[in-house]
């Protein structure tokens, strides 16, 4: 089958290196150094300007290792025709990547069900679609930082907080029909019918708020601020909309409901040694990330696209921002991430695996749940992947680090195994097996300790104990063995998504999270993360949370 397929990465390699991908001889030191990069030339000019203005030397690529001894590679963002410079895929230089994380950190999901019970049972108030709509009008005034109950309160400028709002969703079609459309995330409109039915059944007659606090607030403070900011404005809006006395005992019940009882944080609290609160990156489980990304409701007939959109999202979020900056403070982690979402390489390997699974087992999620399936699929895809690196020297240069190659071969193997079994734990086993096979073939994978979690992971894939094993959907960067090994976390999230899209599931872990991000008012297009990263690299992405309104005039 391998000989009959058109390799998806060949065109990208040809354009990157301007030589035939199978060519085994090349040249060095003749490409112009850093001047071959338009972005580096721009950096140099800005570095001179900064140094002149501040009186302290700034960017100078002639310091340190000479850049550009070989091709300073451009990258084709997979699923797009866009080639970009590597520097533009660093999250500091990419507004789309920043907004990706902003949109997660500033979101909290809060139920209205407990609050409605308090209103009806404790206060004797009537809750109707009309009162819910009135409350939603009130809370959309208040959530950006406006006053509703107290006088002489300072307020935020709506031009600075225009990205802050509240919408609701429910599995009850009759109730949804009564909610004003501007406040509603309509499950029937946003999801294909088979997914909408699953989600509505799971959510039932409950009603939930998708709260977006202002980007500028979560950036200035932290993720743990999100639920507190949300709860304060929700509480004040409830008092105003339902004409309560602010000091009565039920106010405490509303505060508890809005802060604790029906609150879904998108990130869990981290241990003291990592010192982060809720809604911070290290606490975002893989299953939540798979649900946040919305590719599955648009591209559900292309399971590889769906799984790899999650891989790309996780590689950027977990590798570039969490491990690359929160945890290590480094710059080079970007290259680990780009390997998984550029040049159609992982796409090629994973489509090969999917086709193999379909040919061998007659479809996705049809293979037996046993070790023979894991051994078969992971071995086949790993050997195919390693063969490509041997056959195409430019592919080897593209993924110049052994740990990059290990991550990509294992990601394709893990996703393919998850496709076969429809089970994320099986996919994890496929990943671990691929790493061990790869090390057997090449003697090493990458930098020292890269495969630490892979060597011990096989022993606890099916051990469901608090610090040794969890269902893959519930694992995340906070899982002990995954604390500091780059080139793993995003791929694990993709393996989770691969299992659930193979089964035809509408969500991977939490239907509330899936629906909360099916929201067209969000600035980031969650159905197309790789396309958005490309827009950010081209400087075509429009972010939220900007401060131009309060800058000095003329600046």
From Swiss-Prot:
* InterPro entries for the chain: Me_CoM_Rdtase_asu, Me_CoM_Rdtase_asu/bsu_C, Me_CoM_Rdtase_asu_C, Me_CoM_Rdtase_asu_N, Me_CoM_Rdtase_asu_N_sub1, Me_CoM_Rdtase_asu_N_sub2, Me_CoM_Rdtase_Fd-like_fold
What catalytic activity is recorded? coenzyme B + methyl-coenzyme M = methane + coenzyme M-coenzyme B heterodisulfide
Which GO biological-process labels does this protein carry?
Answer: methanogenesis
Q: Which residues does the annotation say bind coenzyme M? A: 336, 448
Q: Does the keyword Metal-binding apply?
A: yes
Q: What does the note accompanying the cofactor annotation read?
A: Binds 2 coenzyme F430 non-covalently per MCR complex. Coenzyme F430 is a yellow nickel porphinoid. Methyl-coenzyme-M reductase is activated when the enzyme-bound coenzyme F430 is reduced to the Ni(I) oxidation state.
**What is the name of the protein in this document?**
Methyl-coenzyme M reductase subunit alpha
């Amino acid at each position: 089958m391998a000989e009959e397929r058109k390799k998806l990465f060949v065109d990208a390699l040809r354009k990157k290196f301007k030589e035939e991908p199978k060519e085994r001889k090349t040249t060095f030191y003749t490409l112009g150094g850093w001047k071959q990069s338009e972005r580096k030339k721009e950096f140099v000019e800005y570095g001179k300007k900064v140094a002149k203005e501040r009186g302290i030397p700034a960017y100078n690529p002639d310091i340190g290792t000479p850049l550009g001894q070989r091709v300073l590679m451009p990258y084709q963002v997979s699923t797009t025709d866009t080639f970009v410079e590597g520097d533009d895929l660093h999250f500091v230089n990419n507004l789309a990547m920043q907004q990706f994380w902003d949109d997660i950190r500033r979101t909290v999901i809060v139920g209205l069900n407990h609050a409605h019970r308090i209103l009806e049972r404790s206060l004797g108030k009537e809750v109707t679609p009309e009162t819910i709509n009135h409350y939603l009008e009130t809370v959309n005034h208040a959530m950006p930082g406006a006053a509703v109950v107290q006088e002489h309160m300072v307020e935020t400028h709506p031009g600075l907080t225009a990205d802050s709002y509240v919408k609701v969703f429910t599995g009850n079609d009759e109730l949804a029909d009564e909610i004003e459309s501007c406040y509603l995330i309509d499950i029937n409109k946003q999801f294909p019918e088979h997914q909408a039915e699953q989600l509505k059944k799971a959510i039932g007659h409950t009603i939930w708020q998708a709260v977006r606090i202002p980007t500028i607030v979560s950036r200035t403070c932290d993720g743990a601020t999100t639920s507190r900011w949300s709860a304060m404005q929700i509480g004040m809006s409830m008092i105003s909309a339902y004409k309560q006395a602010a000091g009565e005992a039920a106010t405490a019940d509303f505060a508890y409901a809005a802060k604790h009882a029906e609150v879904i944080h998108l990130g869990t609290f981290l241990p003291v040694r990592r010192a982060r609160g809720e809604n911070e990156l290290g606490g975002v489980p893989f299953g939540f990330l798979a649900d946040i990304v919305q590719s599955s409701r648009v591209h559900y007939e292309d399971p590889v696209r769906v799984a790899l959109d999650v891989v790309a999202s996780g590689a950027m979020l977990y590798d570039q921002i969490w491990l690359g900056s929160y945890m290590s403070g480094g710059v080079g982690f970007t290259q680990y991430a780009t390997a998984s979402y550029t040049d159609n390489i992982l796409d090629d390997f994973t489509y090969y695996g999917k086709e193999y699974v379909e040919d061998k087992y007659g479809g996705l999620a049809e293979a037996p749940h046993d070790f023979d399936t894991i051994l078969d699929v992971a071995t086949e895809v790993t050997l195919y992947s390693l063969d490509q690196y041997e056959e195409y020297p430019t592919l080897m240069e593209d993924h110049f680090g052994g740990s990059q190659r290990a991550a990509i071969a294992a990601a394709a193997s893990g996703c393919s195994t998850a496709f076969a079994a429809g089970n994320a734990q099986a996919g994890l086993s496929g990943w671990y097996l691929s790493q061990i096979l790869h090390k057997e073939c090449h003697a090493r994978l990458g930098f020292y300790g890269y495969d630490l979690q892979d060597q011990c992971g096989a022993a606890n894939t099916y051990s469901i104990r608090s610090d040794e094993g969890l269902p893959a959907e519930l694992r995340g960067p906070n899982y002990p063995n995954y604390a500091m090994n780059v080139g793993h976390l995003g791929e694990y999230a993709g393996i989770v998504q691969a299992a659930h899209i193979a089964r035809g599931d509408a969500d991977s872990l939490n239907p509330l999270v899936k629906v909360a991000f099916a929201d067209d008012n969000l600035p980031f297009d969650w159905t197309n993360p790789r396309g958005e990263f490309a827009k950010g690299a081209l400087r075509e992405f429009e972010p939220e949370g900007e401060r131009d309104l309060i800058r000095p005039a003329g600046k």
